[in-house]
């Protein structure tokens, strides 16, 4: 069993045990009407749009620095991030919906609930906790699940980042007409990253979609390697959580887009 399969199995167990229903019953609803649109930001931004992530750990990283997360969010916004991603998985990534709820009020930027969504109830909880965007991972969903969850999220006025790992998954994302597509540079079986995976996946990309490169981006040289793939933005977590000089580092990542 891969790490991803293990995580999905755990999510199914949480759904069966009433975890998400309990969250829906106990979390106070957060008004997200003042949140900016990430897609609008991409459309207006001549430089790469940055989704800056809040994370505490991952299955491959257990030693991320402890930060004042409210300050981290403030710094992200001040130094040019266009959206914030917040992990809500507790067991594997050290996040929570309570953290999402607390931090979303600290920024007017769009906030992505980053989790392993397989059921509409999880979308309800994400929205109630203050997310204005959700992540759907093509690899863990059937075509019907992907279509139904995508349409449900859109009906709830949420933006959707549809994550793909190979060209076949990219075609599946096109089938639901996903406006926002994330290319994950992580090998899901071995959980190792290769940033240039983005170049391979986007060789024959279609126009009228926005593309975000995710995972494995540690410095400016990594961005240069994938800039000419025609990406519109980056999702970066570990490098930003480790950085002690966001005022210098984050603006450097916002390179001019190169449309291919």
Swiss-Prot record:
Reaction catalysed by this enzyme: 1-(2-carboxyphenylamino)-1-deoxy-D-ribulose 5-phosphate + H(+) = (1S,2R)-1-C-(indol-3-yl)glycerol 3-phosphate + CO2 + H2O
Record flagged with keyword Amino-acid biosynthesis: yes
Keywords linked to the UniProt accession: Amino-acid biosynthesis, Aromatic amino acid biosynthesis, Decarboxylase, Lyase, Tryptophan biosynthesis
GO biological process, one term: L-tryptophan biosynthetic process
InterPro entries referenced in this protein's UniProt entry, alphabetically: Aldolase_TIM, Indole-3-glycerol_P_synth, Indole-3-glycerol_P_synth_dom, Indole-3-GlycerolPSynthase_CS, RibuloseP-bd_barrel
GO molecular function, one term: indole-3-glycerol-phosphate synthase activity
EC number(s) from the headed UniProt entry: 4.1.1.48
Pathway: Amino-acid biosynthesis; L-tryptophan biosynthesis; L-tryptophan from chorismate: step 4/5
Family: Belongs to the TrpC family.
Entry protein name: Indole-3-glycerol phosphate synthase
Biological source species: Staphylococcus aureus (strain MRSA252)
Taxonomic lineage of the native organism: Bacteria, Bacillati, Bacillota, Bacilli, Bacillales
